[in-house]
């Protein structure tokens, strides 16, 4: 079993790096504002048709463009969900959503969280899934990538005030990265057996003579961007464990690759744009070390079996509860770590049924900010915050002004970095406390004791860090939970983007300093260790008390 797990992890990472390297070169061209070959004429026509100017923006203008697009998308999606019964492509005549569920869903998909307090096949029409959710899957992913584009430019430009043009970046990211790759993935899914139709639900007779209603819909097209954009919201309630979404072991492997593809490619692009590819490799090493350790822990915990069943004398050599038999324990464990390390949230197994230790690792990966590869764009700019913090700590230890890529890190940058890092822990801890203090929060818990608290903590961690997965033992479709989680998702997304853009605006105006003998190298194993230690230290100090009340207490009981 250990050899199989090692081979699975090694194969996954090897294929990932091979695919991400050329994509990273393409992203580097976009960051450097170099159009891809053959696209200049198309871009010129589109810019003219849309009335888009390619004049560069300062950080405030860039931020306002990103926020404006997302707020408009939020309003459109909210009213679309409220009135879906008036809109076409609704063969099942599904009614509009309640105001609180519509708000929660709209915020969820606009913020790239894709938390779902509903069952897709019984709640949303084809039009809502396509024109509403799928469109936001593209736009939210493009928004995250655009923000990291601006931050990378801030490190490479000197004595400037502009960071690029948000509209140009969004258009290029969507047209030349997200749409083509998602199209290829969707076609592959269709070839493997995923659904893609507009038929009404089909009544079929089972082999036992009973009648069953099979849901239909344009699944493959949404499934592709759901994974590529680290969105995670399933067309069906069972998400990627549903055979209509994820029909074969091969599609399952491709889904995991798609989740990590752009975050990995952005690390390669970062190294290429900065002129020092070792910087990108440093980030990949730090992310990969944490990732491999976490996968190993989850695999080990799930292979040990369920201790509660073992205590009863039952056969539980491995923990298969809540897992698809066609995928097994090792693949389910790998997928769980992939989807929570990134801000995806898609699942092929019920995380609520993992062992206490196996379920704690995915929760902790979300709580540290999903910086281990992370979401498209958001993972890298989240990790860059920890890089700045690590550089600052190193500067304190050696008595020098901290520098990164030749830019001095001053008080303003550190205040903004601290603010951005503290946003999500504050939301998680205060949100969980509020839920446990109120009757409306506690009434949604279906399980008592430490596991019930773990379900609450997981839900708020997932929302605040824009992941979207759940422990599922929580009746979250209520006004209290819909509003609480919507607030956490909204602030967790934009409360980090705003200080990140402010940091970019501050750094782009500075001159780059030449490296000296006293400059801390930020590309070697020493800095990789310092960066990993910073991530672990912040995560451990912040969440150990809360984790001790939930999964740790459950593990020890």
Curated annotation (Swiss-Prot):
Domain of life: Bacteria
Subcellular location(s) of the protein: Cell inner membrane
Keywords: Cell inner membrane, Cell membrane, Ion transport, Membrane, Potassium, Potassium transport, Transmembrane, Transmembrane helix, Transport
Gene Ontology molecular functions: P-type potassium transmembrane transporter activity; potassium ion binding
TM ranges: 5-25, 63-83, 132-152, 170-190, 253-273, 283-303, 329-349, 356-376, 379-399, 416-436, 484-504, 526-546
Protein name in UniProt: Potassium-transporting ATPase potassium-binding subunit
Family: Belongs to the KdpA family.
InterPro entries found in the cross-reference section: KdpA
């Amino acid at each position: 079993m250990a050899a199989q797990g090692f081979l699975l992890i090694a194969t996954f990472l090897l294929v990932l790096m091979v695919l991400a390297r050329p994509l990273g070169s393409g992203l580097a061209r976009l960051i450097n504002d170099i159009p891809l070959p053959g696209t200049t004429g198309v871009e010129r026509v589109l810019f003219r048709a849309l009335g888009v100017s390619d004049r560069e923006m300062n950080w405030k203008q860039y931020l306002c463009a990103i926020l404006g697009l997302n707020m408009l998308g939020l309003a459109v999606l909210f009213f679309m969900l409220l009135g879906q019964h008036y809109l076409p492509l609704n063969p099942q005549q599904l009614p509009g959503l309640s105001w609180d569920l519509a708000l929660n869903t709209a915020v969820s998909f606009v913020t790239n969280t894709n938390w779902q307090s509903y069952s897709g096949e019984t709640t949303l029409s084809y039009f809502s899934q396509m024109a509403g959710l799928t469109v936001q899957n593209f736009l939210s992913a493009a928004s995250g990538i655009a923000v990291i584009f601006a931050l990378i430019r801030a490190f490479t430009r000197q004595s400037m005030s502009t960071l690029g043009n948000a509209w140009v970046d969004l258009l290029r990211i969507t047209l030349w990265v997200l749409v083509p790759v998602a199209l290829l993935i969707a076609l592959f899914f269709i070839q493997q057996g995923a659904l893609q139709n507009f038929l009404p639900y089909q009544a079929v007779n089972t082999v036992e003579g009973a009648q069953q209603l099979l849901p239909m819909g344009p699944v493959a097209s949404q499934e592709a961007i759901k994974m590529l954009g680290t969105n995670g919201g399933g067309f069906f309630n069972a998400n990627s464990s549903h055979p209509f979404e994820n029909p074969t072991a091969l599609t399952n492997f491709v889904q995991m690759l798609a989740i990590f593809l752009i975050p990995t490619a952005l690390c390669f692009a970062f190294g290429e744009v900065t002129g020092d590819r070792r910087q990108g490799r440093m980030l990949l090493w730090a992310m990969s070390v944490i990732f491999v350790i976490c996968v190993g822990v989850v695999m080990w915990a799930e292979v040990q079996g369920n201790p509660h069943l073992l205590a009863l004398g039952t056969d539980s050599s491995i923990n298969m509860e809540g897992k698809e038999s066609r995928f097994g324990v090792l693949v389910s464990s790998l997928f769980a770590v992939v989807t929570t390390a990134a801000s995806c949230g898609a699942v092929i197994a019920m995380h609520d049924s993992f062992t206490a230790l196996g379920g704690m690792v995915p929760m902790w990966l979300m709580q540290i900010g999903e910086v281990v590869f992370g979401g498209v764009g958001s993972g890298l700019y989240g990790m860059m915050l920890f890089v700045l913090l690590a550089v600052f700590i190193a500067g304190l230890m050696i008595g020098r002004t901290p520098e990164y890529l030749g830019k001095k890190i001053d008080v303003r940058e550190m205040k903004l970095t601290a603010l951005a890092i503290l946003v999500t822990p504050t939301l998680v801890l205060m949100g969980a406390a509020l839920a446990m203090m109120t009757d409306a929060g506690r009434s949604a818990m279906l399980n008592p004791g430490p596991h019930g608290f773990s379900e609450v903590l997981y839900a708020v961690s997932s929302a605040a860090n824009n992941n979207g997965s759940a422990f599922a033992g929580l009746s979250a479709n209520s006004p209290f939970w819909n509003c609480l989680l919507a607030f956490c998702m909204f602030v967790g997304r934009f409360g980090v983007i705003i200080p990140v853009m402010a940091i970019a605006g501050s750094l782009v105006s500075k001159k780059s300093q030449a490296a000296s003998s006293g400059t801390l190298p930020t590309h070697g194993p020493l800095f990789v260790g310092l960066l990993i230690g910073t991530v672990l230290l912040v995560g451990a100090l912040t969440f150990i008390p809360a984790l001790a009340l939930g999964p740790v207490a459950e593990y020890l009981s």
